[in-house]
Amino acid sequence: MSMSVQGAIAANRFGLGAKPGEIEAASVNPRTWLKQQLQAIEFNDGLASSSELEIALAEYQRDRKRAKKMADVKNPSVQFGKSAQKMSIAVAKRAIDSNVSLSWRLLDFFSNHFSVSSSGRTMVALAPTLEREAIAPNLDQRFEQMLLSVVRHPAMLIYLNNERSFGPNSLAGKRGRGLNENLAREI
């Protein structure tokens, strides 16, 4: 098989960098090769969902308060950080080893577009789930669908402080706690 400039461009510019044999494969028909790259991204099934992580975070906060009362010197936040780091490494390895690097490149692009800060335990845990639960499943959908999925995701709601936002006609809204405009500014 021979290599072409178009094949090299397809494999390098639209993916995560060519792996051995990819330039040759893309050179046969670069457009077809790129279209074949647009497949659903598979994540490790063992990764926790945002719902599971929210429960774990609540339990962590409860245990932390108990430990403080009992003057326990263990630091559970160290273990929490290690789990988040392991999850990031696992996702990066999966992207590198994948045969659909264009899909991973698009995921990276939209993850940067809809970025959330991962400061604080809650966001360290939830930020990666935004990618898996709201962005990746919508890569082949209309942008509007992805946007709606992202803005309704717990990580984005917490990042923009919208989990504390109330409608103007709700009981909380009538007490002066109304809508949070952070989301509107971001969009």
Predicted regions and their residues:
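A contiguous strand-loop segment
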Residues: 1-187
